[in-house]
A protein has these predicted regions:
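Conserved residues at the C-terminal ends of beta-strands
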Residues: 90
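Conserved N-terminal beta1-alpha1 strand-loop-helix module at the mouth
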Residues: 1-82, 86, 94-96
């Protein structure tokens, strides 16, 4: 069995996000985990597909995107186009997936 490490950038400072991603690019981690929160499904608010797209410009790591949002079906294609490689979401709130 092979273990994959997927560090989350959520704990980092968004004012220093480029440095965080560049450091992760130099690490042995194969994945970068993004916790996307909409302020509705969960009380916190993080970032959207444009942020994923911007980060994709300077990283070739696997983007592991965790959508903690309502109406995943409305936004799924946006996150795919943004450069997500893996998308995880909560099925209990999405009837049309």
């Amino acid at each position: 069995m092979s273990i994959k490490i997927s560090p989350s950038i959520l704990g980092g400072s968004f004012s220093n996000i480029e440095r965080i991603i560049l450091d992760l690019n130099q690490s042995k981690a194969e994945y970068i985990h993004f916790d996307v929160m909409d302020g509705d499904f969960v009380p916190n608010l993080t970032f959207g597909p444009k942020f994923i797209s911007n980060v994709r410009e300077f990283s070739n790591k696997v983007f592991d995107v965790h959508l903690m949002i309502n109406r995943v079906e409305k936004f799924l294609d946006d996150y795919i186009r943004a450069g997500s490689d893996i998308i995880t979401f909560h099925i209990e709130i999405n009837e049309d997936i």
